């Protein structure tokens, strides 16, 4: 496929996404790639993200190029509440001077049934329009870390070693028998079963993970992995997250996660 054909295919995929979810009764939204920001309203996490963002000042006003749709919509709807419970979008995101096209959904009534229906529809779009399918799924939950590791041990060094799966370093700092070390020693496909030995069966994170595992099995997905190493990109990501890796185009990953800040929601996004 030459450059012109790739461009046409990309634009057709964007349009097809909007048509598909418009038909499914999602509200379509179109926000400017240029965000107007107020320094006084930016929190510590906002400021930390400025390192990857392109921003400038004009007449005492700060502007920045969009780097995250969920964050932009959350910021906007916090100021201007919407009656919409599910929205669909397409457009550019720019991170570290690299531009990419993203399509995605935000579910502002994030019941289990609503979120799973959104994921099901998204995968159907991938199958029908992108001619691809989900090869394997990664599940995780941002409450797991607190369940497995005492707050006093959640130092930058230890968190970094967990993220890097540095077992030798973790053994030094935590011990061989520590739950995190024991879980990470297992194959990621087995870690959800192993997790049950280290946290109570009624722990909300484990309950939610098992519900999702069972649902994914009913959808025909058996290759399911647990990730206990991921740390939330923003503090408002407090619950379950999912990554659906593609069978044909291995560089594509449908990602999603629950968040609760000034707005509660569950977002799903795919970079084309």
Swiss-Prot record:
TM segment ranges: none
UniProt GO cellular component terms: cytoplasm
Instruction: Tell me yes or no: is Isomerase among this UniProt entry's keywords.
Output: no
SUPFAM superfamilies attached here? Class II aaRS and biotin synthetases
Q: Which GO terms describe its biological process?
A: L-histidine biosynthetic process
| Annotated localization | Cytoplasm
Domain of life, source organism: Bacteria
Give the metabolic or biological pathway.
Amino-acid biosynthesis; L-histidine biosynthesis; L-histidine from 5-phospho-alpha-D-ribose 1-diphosphate: step 1/9
Q: Supply one GO molecular-function term.
A: transferase activity
What keywords are annotated for this sequence in UniProt? Amino-acid biosynthesis, Cytoplasm, Histidine biosynthesis
Amino-acid biosynthesis keyword on record: yes
Q: How does it assemble?
A: Heteromultimer composed of HisG and HisZ subunits.
- Give the protein's function: Required for the first step of histidine biosynthesis. May allow the feedback regulation of ATP phosphoribosyltransferase activity by histidine.
Q: What else is known?
A: This function is generally fulfilled by the C-terminal part of HisG, which is missing in some bacteria such as this one.
What family is it from?
Belongs to the class-II aminoacyl-tRNA synthetase family. HisZ subfamily.
- Give the matching NCBIfam families: PRK12294.1
Q: Under which name does UniProt file this protein?
A: ATP phosphoribosyltransferase regulatory subunit
Annotated source species: Staphylococcus aureus (strain JH1)
Gene that specifies this protein? hisZ
């Amino acid at each position: 496929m030459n450059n012109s054909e790739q461009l046409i295919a990309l634009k057709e995929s964007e349009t097809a996404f909007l048509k598909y979810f418009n038909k499914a009764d999602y509200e379509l939204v179109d926000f400017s790639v240029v965000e107007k920001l107020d320094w006084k309203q930016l929190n510590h996490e906002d400021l930390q993200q400025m390192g990857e963002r392109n921003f400038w000042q004009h007449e005492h006003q700060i502007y920045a190029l969009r780097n995250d749709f969920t964050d932009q919509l959350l910021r906007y709807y916090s100021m201007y509440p919407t009656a919409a419970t599910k929205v669909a979008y397409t457009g550019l995101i720019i991170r570290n001077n690299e531009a990419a096209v993203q399509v995605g959904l935000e579910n502002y009534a994030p019941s289990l049934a609503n979120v799973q229906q959104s994921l099901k529809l998204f995968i159907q779009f991938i199958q029908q329009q992108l001619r691809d399918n989900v090869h394997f799924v990664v599940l995780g939950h941002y409450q797991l870390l607190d369940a497995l590791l005492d707050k006093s041990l959640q130092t930058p060094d230890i968190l970094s070693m967990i993220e890097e799966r540095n077992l030798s370093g973790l053994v030094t700092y935590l011990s061989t028998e520590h739950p995190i070390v024991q879980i990470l020693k297992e194959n990621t496909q087995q870690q959800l079963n192993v997790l049950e030995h280290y946290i109570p069966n009624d722990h909300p994170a484990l309950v939610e993970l098992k519900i999702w595992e069972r649902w994914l099995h009913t959808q025909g997905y058996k290759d399911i992995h647990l990730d206990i190493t991921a740390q939330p990109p923003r503090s408002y990501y407090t619950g379950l997250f999912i990554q659906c890796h593609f069978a044909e185009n291995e560089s594509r990953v449908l990602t999603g996660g629950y968040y609760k800040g000034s707005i509660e929601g569950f977002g799903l996004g795919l970079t084309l």
